[in-house]
Amino acid sequence: MDTPASLNDLQHTTLAIVLAGGRGTRLGPLTNKRVKPAVHFGGKYRIIDFALSNCLNSGIRRIAVVTQYKAHSLLRHVQRGWGFLRGEFNEFIDLWPAQQRVEGAHWYRGTADAVFQNLDIIRSIRPKYVVVLAGDHIYKMDYTRMVMDHVESKADCTVGCIEVPRMEAVAFGVMHVDEERRVTGFVEKPADPPAMPGHPDIALASMGIYVFNADYLYSLLEDNITSVATDHDFGKDIIPRVVTSGNAIAHPFSMSCVSSDPSVEPYWRDVGTIDAYWAANLDLASTIPSLDLYDRNWPIWTHQEQLPPAKFVRDLNGLQGTGTNMIVCGGCVISGSQISRSVLSSNVVVNSFCNIAEAVLLPQVSIGASCRLRKVVIDRGCHIPDGTVIGEDPVRDGERFYRTDSGVVLVTAEALKRQTAR
């Protein structure tokens, strides 16, 4: 394979495919109405904005978003917020919903099948390289560095990887690599993840980011679709096949992580559980967060609603609304309440005499007067009645709402309706 003549050539011969059709069942009721990449994050963003922004900032401007499960809010968000690329310059973000495009008339049966069913579109774009991305992780990464590493190493497939605590690796593909970063073993979501040599408590996990030579990817997908014993999945089928019969190279996240502070540990989060989602949101409210949303050299783009500025006001008794270590978005009004280490999304209203800590409030949440809330995620559009207390009585919380083993409480409109019906 010839090395591209320039970085510009590399960027213009790469197609990024963002997989955004999964149910996200580990997020519980939070994904009952929306696909996981469409879930709000960090106050003003959607989860998918991080993968799309990475593409844009990396100079990769030919992007496809593959959708299936409850995709309406995701499709609307991408159409409204990401329609600024110029087709006349061969820039685009295409939406590829499941359409039963191939013989057999079935929906996407797995991540690999989702790409296979769009092979005719991919071939018409004529990329040299295809970057396959999960649309549900939080991180900043220069994909062009990874593509360049792929080309320079003469790999058939390059797999993004990161070191994680061994027992957390049960949710990921786990890799073995040799001294030259060649992948020699790969197992998807093992019950007992193998440790890295010399590091018994650490495993090398796949980030769900792959770079393929386009022609090689086509042949892999065409072979996979005819296999009897297959889940049509990249992690379960395609990557193990490359490891055994091709040249798969590991690409450590540290090689292409984008950070405004090189001394900070590379930040990547799978927000696939309520606990992880809550913690990653609150990471952003830290004094010096590991993920810098204020880096003008690598901005996170999103749909910008036209909203009034946030404000803190005194209530009728003169009590001042205050907040520390928190993110507050446009349209928010905080009246005479104390809030700490929290994320308030757009159009959140907090009435007087409340005490709120370690809370993630999604858009259009309204908090009644005299509420005490701690360690909560409150879904979009919920109204919390006056005097509500959450986060102080584990038994009571579990009876009323979805509560994780670590004590994070998810409040949804459906759960609130059940309370009023009793």
Swiss-Prot record:
Protein name, entry field: Glucose-1-phosphate adenylyltransferase
Gene name tied to this protein: glgC
BP GO annotations: glycogen biosynthetic process
Keyword Metal-binding: no
Pathway terms, separated by semicolons: Glycan biosynthesis; glycogen biosynthesis
Family: Belongs to the bacterial/plant glucose-1-phosphate adenylyltransferase family.
Keyword match Transferase: yes
Top-level lineage group: Bacteria
Keywords of this entry: ATP-binding, Carbohydrate metabolism, Glycogen biosynthesis, Glycogen metabolism, Nucleotide-binding, Nucleotidyltransferase, Transferase
